[in-house]
Amino acid sequence: MAEDIEEIRKKKLLELQKRYLEQQKAQEEAIRQEMELEAQLNAIMRHILTPEARERLGRVKLVRPELARQVELVLVQLYQAGQIREPIDDAKLKKILAQIDARTRRDFRIKW
């Protein structure tokens, strides 16, 4: 009887260890894929943005990461569709930021 309990404990421990290793591998794979996508995104941004525009987008990313991500996704879509023919400068990026910000910003009004 005690041997059966010990055997069950060992099986359970092995099963838990196996499950933990599988989860860890899945997390590592997800992190690796995310890093690859981020590297590809950065390469595209270097190609389609001027240095000043990249710097501005970096500052926006510090303050409003969700807005910066939306802008990056829009720029990648435009680039893949062939609609970006020349590098986007700082002035054009400001306009794009303003347009996307206007679409996503919500006004909160407090009535007294």
From Swiss-Prot:
Matching entries from InterPro entries are given as: DNA_bind_arc, PDCD5-like, PDCD5-like_sf
Note the Pfam families from the entry: dsDNA_bind (PF01984)
The yes or no answer to whether the keyword DNA-binding is present is: yes
Keyword list (alphabetical) reads: DNA-binding
Q: Give the highest taxon in the source lineage.
A: Archaea
- Molecular function (GO) terms listed? DNA binding
One GO CC term of this entry?
cytosol
Question: What NCBIfam families does the entry give?
Answer: PRK04239.1
Q: Which family does it belong to?
A: Belongs to the PDCD5 family.
What name does this protein carry?
DNA-binding protein TON_1102
